[in-house]
């Protein structure tokens, strides 16, 4: 029975809800679009301060299936017109529509529902507060109205609404009228209402807000306007360009597909390389939009030229494709039509605020030039000793000669509301959603704000003028919460988002965190159940006079080290009362440079990861400097015992250590200088390698080896703990040259020695291209280079370290214990003489190699090898081969002096050489 009643109720309410979409005004225009959705919070922040219970038709639609009482439905429905009349001025179109909707609910909807539920009544939501509209008249914008208790009672204001209005008065929130509002006021007729798909509240400043705002002259400037985003400061021709690009996205072809789809991006160079040989000046719609955003177009004509160039390129390249030609012609036709429409409009249609604002690229104050993207210190009326930190987003001038800027504000810790146990970096600021207009006279000087993620990696390479701040979080003033900024470029002006931020790397940097500067403001009787307090507001043209603190529960996870009461903390943060660490302290930035590992060199781990905290965990009982490996010994202090026959690199050890473990930090070098430096180091390393083959070996330093350095790097770059890694081998080492992408030089492992590179050029373009296109790692050792095709891990077992003559011996035949694989053997180049090959091959002392060799020489080279018939034999004759070998072994002299010495390979330890190279190497040994 209850289910039947609920089904009937929902059906009844759905019928009454649908009826409102047929409601029209006296001119036959439907009014529902005005109340369909709520206004955007960023554009109308004051709406959500005044309206305590915002509801739209869409909100009502979502609640329909959940209503169990018809009275709740009527209460929510009645809230919609009441909110509209509360926020909007009496003479506005929206206010009139709200009265019409209210009458419809009372006369139709409530009447129909009462037929089935007689107890339903229209709710009394109170009187519409009129004092707000009166207090916000333009003549009173410069003064704060004083609302007496008597006036509040007359206006029907409850204490909560009085607080909301007081907060709104202090912020002086101001909304700019739109083009549509301007045309409505000019027409002054109800036949031209707003028909957007969302509620567009009109400002409460006056019944005719557009006219009043437009008439404000330079004698009463609109200073310190609070916005949720930067204002649009464009000349009429720029607005024409934007309108055309916006309308072009709506154009479709005969198949109802977007017409501009083929013009959005340029063809991929790898897929269509011929495009860039045919088209000498490529351009696409994406490039055009970037030019518009970065203000590259100085007039409308240059935009037309670029668009026509794009069409010409398209027609030229696809001249044989009739469908693409038709598409380009259709797009050109629509473009010309839109151009005619936009150019026919007067410039006044693009001036919604009634005044002309000229965008500026830069301004000059006190012999200092400022431009968009600069970080500045602005005048703070609340405290002149703490200027406002901001970034310039817009610069413009007005017809009266005044110059203005729009800046995004960054709050200091003492200007925010936060938990009393929250920690802050030295000179930390938080990004807000406030974009304020200032006269340029408010600029007090320059500063710089660096993103924390970048500051972890190093210092900015550009010169910093003024104080430097660090920013990691975005501060939400409404919810009093801090959110980590993941994408810093999204916080910057569009003109700067494509620019790189060069950074000088700094390793081992850790950050001190400090208690809240306003922690003493916590009330003595504060509890965890207290409401989040509000900041103390001062002047409306400045950040809060002082923030507030409150108690919060202890967090189980604190991935970012935000609170002093948390058990977990990243190791790059040093909290108060943490054990001291050794290093160089920078008191100005609140950082310390240590030799221990930090997460600054580690990949960013998602906050939801379950393995982040165990690897980053730091407690007071265990200093953060003791980053432990699997052996429970600090990694940088482990004593790695090396095998006695490992080569100690005397000449390369110091340079390798400097590059891999503790890189020097230059002030700044251009990419070309860095490349030259890398090349010079490379040639120096090569010369040392050549000298090492003739010079007597000296015992290398035991403090640093390649194994210790590679283990250190592994610990830096991995979030897991690895066992000890050994890479040393006789005659093998890694060249200390930084790996650079797209370097088309011989900086990778090749088949020929670099000392004979000039001779290799005689082989022709094919051999050179084969060398240049190699992408293997830079590995060198005494002897010729080899093409690395497989990397294996050394097991440390002598049984698998097989010398080359394991398969070659004149006095001994041995069966190969692996599967036979046919492979063609390439003859060495004819241009290489035997003397040259002898110079190239300079085998070092005994060298063991851990590898699985799958090779079988071809028949035409079998004369240079031992009898390898056993390699080709199958399983059927395996027993005969074993028997023959056993009989030969019995008659063979086993004295050491009759044994042939092991032939060492020239491959690097832990690397497999190609079968082609090994066959060539064995053949040359046989000639000896």
UniProtKB/Swiss-Prot annotation:
Gene Ontology molecular function: any one: chromatin binding
Region (Disordered): 558-586, 598-635, 657-701, 871-908
Role: Component of the chromatin structure remodeling complex (RSC), which is involved in transcription regulation and nucleosome positioning. RSC is responsible for the transfer of a histone octamer from a nucleosome core particle to naked DNA. The reaction requires ATP and involves an activated RSC-nucleosome intermediate. Remodeling reaction also involves DNA translocation, DNA twist and conformational change.
Alphabetically ordered keywords of this record: Bromodomain, Chromatin regulator, Nucleus, Phosphoprotein, Repeat, Sporulation, Transcription, Transcription regulation
Bromo domain sequence ranges: 4-112, 240-342
Skewed-composition ranges (Low complexity): 621-631, 692-701
Organism, scientific name: Saccharomyces cerevisiae (strain ATCC 204508 / S288c) (Baker's yeast)
Additional information: Present with 259 molecules/cell in log phase SD medium.
Name of the protein this chain belongs to: Chromatin structure-remodeling complex subunit RSC1
Biased composition (Acidic residues): 883-902
Self-association state and partner proteins as the record states: Component of the two forms of the RSC complex composed of at least either RSC1 or RSC2, and ARP7, ARP9, LDB7, NPL6, RSC3, RSC30, RSC4, RSC58, RSC6, RSC8, RSC9, SFH1, STH1, HTL1 and probably RTT102. The complexes interact with histone and histone variant components of centromeric chromatin.
Protein origin, superkingdom: Eukaryota
